[in-house]
């Protein structure tokens, strides 16, 4: 009841007098809220589309996340008034220190906290990276098929797109890179999306040498690198480049969307020291700083061992799910489909052997409440 009166006061229909009560306003508002038209009332969607439904691409097992522990960490920092104001646009120092240690131990990334920029997910990191090292008209060599959002970014920024065709099981031909005059190469070397191939150490070395000799840039998206089921993951390309003394042309991108949950919207960009200030200028123009309470909670989640424990648990869970999915595909589809991706990550890539209409199959999957990408 009180809320209703307060709303009428806010809209100008009533006046409030302390100790006396509410009175009808002498001067009523000049405009009244219009009555919703019949079109507006009937325009609600007929069916709710759950973007996190079964087999939705890129969505981790949200039910398996330790939400109680995460809520405890958030609560720990919500009462810190020092976090309520403007913050360092580069990101929380505590988080960058924790992240530098984590990346060094888990992915052999060579970086200091000063070279890490916290972003609103991997997509913002990719936007910053390309805007700093490229100009309109520059040529970007990119895996095909590949990450659709990166393809959109290339088109939006008016870069030239040069496809780097990925073969089943084999990956792309490294000679296609070393013979290219592209200004930048975007790759997912640890688990190519969506074909699931991996670059070995020799191939990575050739690509690093090409970038240095051609004064080109490598943008390494370490997509799904935490979830390898068939073999131990290779170290990051950036880490190998540092061992070779040639990491000055590599920008490293990652996020926590797959290892934690998509709604976190925290990613990171590791760049050569000489690019840090330029990246911060671009980030400031795009969005400013990232939510600080969440960053501080994530820093604690990393340093207190919560992230590693969660990753180990999810690696076992996803391996079991991957094996079961593979068996189910064989059981229900037999020789009609071929699995072309490796045992890694949160997706399985299929190839139809009998000319199945992908559009028809997608509609059938949607009818059953599932999702698949074409």
Model region roles, listed by residue range:
Residues 77, 81-215, 219, 225-227, ...:
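Conserved core of the PLP fold type I
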């Amino acid at each position: 009841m009180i809320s209703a009166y307060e709303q009428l006061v806010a809209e100008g229909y009533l006046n409030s007098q302390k100790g006396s009560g509410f009175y009808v306003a002498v001067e009523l508002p000049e405009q009244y809220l219009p009555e919703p038209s019949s079109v507006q009332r009937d325009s609600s969607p007929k069916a709710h589309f759950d973007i996190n439904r079964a087999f939705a691409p890129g969505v981790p097992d949200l039910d398996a996340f330790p939400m109680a522990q995460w809520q405890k960490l958030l609560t720990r920092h919500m009462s810190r008034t020092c976090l309520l104001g403007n913050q360092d646009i580069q990101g929380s120092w505590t988080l960058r220190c924790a992240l530098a240690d984590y990346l060094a131990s888990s992915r052999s990334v060579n970086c200091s906290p000063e070279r890490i920029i916290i972003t609103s997910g991997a997509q913002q990191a990719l936007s910053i990276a390309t805007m700093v090292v490229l100009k309109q008209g520059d040529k970007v060599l990119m895996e095909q098929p590949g990450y659709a959002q990166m393809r959109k970014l290339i088109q939006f920024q008016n870069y030239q797109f040069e496809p780097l065709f990925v073969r089943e099981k084999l990956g792309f031909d490294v000679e296609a890179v070393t013979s290219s005059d592209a200004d930048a190469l975007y790759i997912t070397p640890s688990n190519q999306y969506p074909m699931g191939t991996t670059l070995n150490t020799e191939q990575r070395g050739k690509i690093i040498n090409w970038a240095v000799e051609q004064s080109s840039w490598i943008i390494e998206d370490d997509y799904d690198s935490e979830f390898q089921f068939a073999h131990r993951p290779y170290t990051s390309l950036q880490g190998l480049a540092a061992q070779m003394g040639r990491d000055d042309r590599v920008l490293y991108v990652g996020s926590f969307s797959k290892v934690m949950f998509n709604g976190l919207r925290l990613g990171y960009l590791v760049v050569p020291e000489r690019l840090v200030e330029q990246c911060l200028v671009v980030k400031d123009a795009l969005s400013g700083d990232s939510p600080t309470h969440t960053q501080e909670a994530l820093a604690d989640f990393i340093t207190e061992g919560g992230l590693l424990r969660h990753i180990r648990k999810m690696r076992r869970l996803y391996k079991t799910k991957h094996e079961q999915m593979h068996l189910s595909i064989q059981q229900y589809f037999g020789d009609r489909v071929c699995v072309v991706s490796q045992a890694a990550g949160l997706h399985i890539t299929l190839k139809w052997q009998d000319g199945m209409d992908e559009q028809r199959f997608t509609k059938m999957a949607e009818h059953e409440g599932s999702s698949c990408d074409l």
